[in-house]
Amino acid sequence: MTITDLVLILFIAALLAFAIYDQFIMPRRNGPTLLAIPLLRRGRIDSVIFVGLIVILIYNNVTNHGALITTWLLSALALMGFYIFWIRVPKIIFKQKGFFFANVWIEYSRIKAMNLSEDGVLVMQLEQRRLLIRVRNIDDLEKIYKLLVSTQ
């Protein structure tokens, strides 16, 4: 096993740990989930480039008769990338005292202002930054509003 294979195993383990945390652990942290809203995905061009480069590496490894374990590890990395970028649905998870957005816990007390843009993007102003929340279904904005009014 080469250092390349060890690095591939490390990246696969990191992506697998992220997927498990995102899917199973995060919804159970900080109390019961009051509301989970699916969000729009960001640009997919990055994911196409990532998976495309891995496919090129697989092709290069096969044509140069590289190690079989490297081919399998690259295939596993491509599958993990496909899951993370195309199958997994990003979501905002609301709890009693705060919410998870982009896998970061934000307490309701940190929200200084909220606005709704013309194109249906909920803008939350925190102390240092703005959160741009793009929901998949525009009707979910009303659910978020009702939840925030009831918890405040």
Swiss-Prot record:
Q: Where do transmembrane segments lie in this chain?
A: 6-26, 45-65, 67-87
Q: Residue ranges, Cytoplasmic compartment?
A: 27-44, 88-152
Q: What is the membrane topology here?
A: Multi-pass membrane protein
Q: Which gene encodes it?
A: yobD
Task: Spell out the GO cellular component terms annotated for this protein, sorted alphabetically and separated by semicolons.
Answer: plasma membrane
Q: Where is this chain primarily localised?
A: membrane
The keyword Lipid metabolism is assigned to this record: no
| Name of the protein | UPF0266 membrane protein YobD
Q: Which Pfam families match?
A: DUF986
Similarity comment text for this entry: Belongs to the UPF0266 family.
Which compartment or compartments is the protein found in? Answer: Cell inner membrane
Topological domains on the Periplasmic side lie at 1-5, 66
> Which InterPro entries does the UniProt entry name for this protein?
DUF986
Keywords in alphabetical order: Cell inner membrane, Cell membrane, Membrane, Transmembrane, Transmembrane helix
